[in-house]
């Protein structure tokens, strides 16, 4: 995540409001920080945060404008697996709470099946839709889904399609 190193967490989250000339409302910043579990870190600086916390600040910064569409391009790719699993669960909780559309780009078959209700697989250049999958999963999802036979079957199905796309290129 790209954060302003000289700015506090709250100042980083406030940035989109300033850029869009939206009247500053402290309550919106605090609400976004609370949503991502960082309400107590508003006065911290990025250098004082873990990688997962920095990612949460970036998510709060995106949420402060109350978007109807959230675009996320590999936001968890550089994180360790434990942090990634936690943020996956947090993202699902936010999605349910905010009721907004999330377009999530990932290179992880496992992450795509866990997070998605629908998966679009693209070909390499030029990018075209190569396959589409509807993910059948219980709602709300829980960590136990990752160890279920249904999850394993869907991961195998998506992996097989990925292997076919790779063989064609």
Listing of model-derived features with the role each one plays in the protein:
Residues 4-26, 35:
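ABC-type ATPase nucleotide-binding domains, specifically the catalytic core motifs of the NBD
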Residues 22-41, 93:
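Conserved ABC ATPase "signature" region
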Residues 44-47, 65:
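Conserved signature/switch motifs of ABC ATPase nucleotide-binding domains
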Residues 59:
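Hydrophobic anchor residue at the start of the ABC signature
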Residues 70-73:
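Catalytic Walker B motif of ABC-type/P-loop ATPase nucleotide-binding domains
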Residues 84-98:
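Helical segment within the ABC ATPase nucleotide-binding domain
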Residues 100-105:
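Conserved H-loop
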């Amino acid at each position: 995540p790209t954060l302003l190193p000289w700015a506090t967490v709250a100042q980083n989250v406030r940035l989109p409001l300033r850029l869009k000339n939206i009247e500053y409302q402290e309550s919106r910043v605090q609400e976004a920080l609370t949503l991502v579990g960082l309400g107590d870190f508003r006065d911290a600086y990025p250098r004082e945060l873990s990688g997962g916390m920095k990612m949460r600040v970036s998510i709060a910064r995106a949420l402060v404008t109350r978007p109807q569409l959230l675009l996320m391009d590999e936001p968890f790719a550089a994180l360790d697996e434990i942090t990634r699993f936690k943020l996956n669960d947090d993202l699902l909780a936010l999605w349910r709470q905010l009721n907004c559309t999330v377009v999530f780009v990932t290179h992880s078959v496992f992450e795509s099946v866990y997070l998605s209700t629908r998966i679009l697989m693209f070909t390499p250049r030029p990018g075209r839709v190569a396959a589409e999958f509807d993910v059948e999963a219980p709602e709300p999802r829980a960590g136990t889904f990752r160890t279920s036979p249904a999850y394993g079957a869907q991961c195998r199905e998506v992996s097989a399609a990925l292997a076919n796309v790779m063989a064609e290129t």
